[in-house]
């Protein structure tokens, strides 16, 4: 392993653990995203700085603000800790959020979008750009109503800042999607990957085919890489012009490093997660690391919402089961009472001998 990659691997683990100490009750998956935010900038997470930025978020928001949500607060604090004036950045993100809320639902996805746009030093969010983002999102929804969700609103706004027309963006996303969906069973993941490609130069079909080739090369190298939420980060890495064999070798080296670290098991899902984190680390060396981080943030939000819904569903099932048992018990009690009453009635009706 080359020294640069080895350092990134070590920094990733250190950053993950530092964020975990500050946000003890948040999801482990968020710690990994935050760790890569720091690695992508060549910075190290600092406990005191993170705590300071957590207070900045509280200072500039109300009690039940989406900015304080456990699904995003660690990511936001990490991003704030990297800028010289976090209070100014927080104010700008708040202003952007207010503007975006006129066109999109005020969810954690929109909070994340506002922060990402506030990080674009050479761009300014205007009413016109927000409307353009909304129009791009509507086009996505019209084209693939079932596949399009809140995650796509983040990409729609980022796409709105590209120099391409709405027609060009829509056509490129569709062209890339058609190539990818022949190769991968997850249509939603294919659409997100195609959106990542639309924000870069080159022919969409060629970019999609390069992703197919990279994925196949990972499979041949016996690296367990998923093709659901994991696909978009791999697409962002594939934007790099680094030869595929080099990327595969580095991903394998990072994967081997993570194998010996705390938090990685041997189940299939855990192997896929480990490979995803290896891709994250490798991407920090190349063009496309910003897109990797965006896909990681949105995918992690999706996962956290899915877990929340599953938890609510599980709770609802338990409640229903308990109610059914109560009804059944009540019914049995009534039946027993009825039997006893009938027996007494029969006994009273029997003639004396």
Question: What feature does the model see in each segment?
Answer:
Residues 1-91, 98-112, 281-284, 305-331:
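N-terminal domain-start signal
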Residues 2, 7, 21-24, 51, ...:
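Context-gated lysine
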Residues 2-4, 15, 26-29, 46, ...:
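Serine/threonine-rich low-complexity intrinsically disordered regions
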Residues 13-16, 48-60, 88-100, 127-140, ...:
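Alpha-helical repeat scaffolds
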Residues 30-40, 70-81, 108-119, 151-160, ...:
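Amphipathic alpha-helical elements of HEAT/ARM-like alpha-solenoid repeat scaffolds that form extended
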Residues 40-48, 82-88, 120-127, 164-166, ...:
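Short coil/turn connectors between adjacent alpha-helices in alpha-solenoid helical repeat scaffolds
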Residues 122-126, 138-268:
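A contiguous, surface-oriented mixed alpha/beta subdomain in the mid-to-C-terminal portion of proteins
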Residues 209, 213-353:
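C-terminal structured domains
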């Amino acid at each position: 392993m080359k020294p640069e990659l080895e350092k990134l691997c070590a920094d990733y683990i250190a950053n993950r653990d530092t964020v975990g100490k500050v946000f003890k009750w948040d999801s482990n998956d968020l710690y990994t995203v935050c760790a890569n935010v720091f690695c992508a900038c060549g910075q190290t997470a600092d406990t005191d700085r993170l705590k300071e930025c957590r207070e900045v978020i509280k200072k500039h928001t109300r009690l039940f603000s989406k900015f304080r949500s456990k699904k995003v607060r660690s990511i936001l604090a990490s991003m704030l800790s990297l800028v010289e004036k976090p209070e100014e950045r927080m104010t700008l993100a708040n202003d952007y959020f207010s503007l975006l809320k006129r066109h999109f639902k005020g969810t954690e996805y929109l909070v994340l979008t506002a922060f990402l746009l506030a990080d674009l030093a050479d761009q300014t969010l205007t009413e016109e750009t927000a409307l353009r983002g909304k129009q791009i999102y509507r086009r996505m929804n019209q084209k693939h109503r079932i596949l399009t969700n809140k995650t796509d609103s983040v990409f729609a706004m980022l796409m709105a800042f590209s120099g391409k027309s709405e027609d060009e963006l829509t056509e490129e996303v569709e062209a890339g999607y058609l190539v990818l969906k022949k190769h991968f069973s997850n249509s939603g993941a294919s659409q997100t990957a195609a959106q990542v490609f639309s924000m870069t130069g080159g022919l969409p079909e060629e970019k999609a085919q390069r992703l197919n080739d990279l994925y196949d090369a990972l499979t041949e190298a016996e690296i367990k890489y998923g093709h659901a939420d994991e696909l978009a980060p791999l697409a962002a890495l594939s934007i790099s012009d680094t030869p595929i064999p080099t990327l595969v070798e580095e991903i394998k080296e990072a994967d081997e490093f993570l194998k010996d670290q705390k938090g990685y098991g041997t189940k299939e899902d855990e192997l896929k997660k480990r490979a995803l984190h290896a891709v994250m680390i490798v991407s920090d060396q190349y063009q496309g690391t910003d897109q990797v981080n965006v896909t990681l943030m949105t995918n992690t939000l999706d996962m956290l919402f899915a877990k929340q819904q599953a938890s609510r569903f599980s709770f609802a099932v338990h409640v229903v089961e308990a109610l059914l048992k109560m009804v059944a018990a009540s019914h049995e009690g009534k039946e027993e009472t009825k039997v006893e009453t009938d027996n007494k009635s029969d006994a009273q009706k029997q003639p004396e001998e």
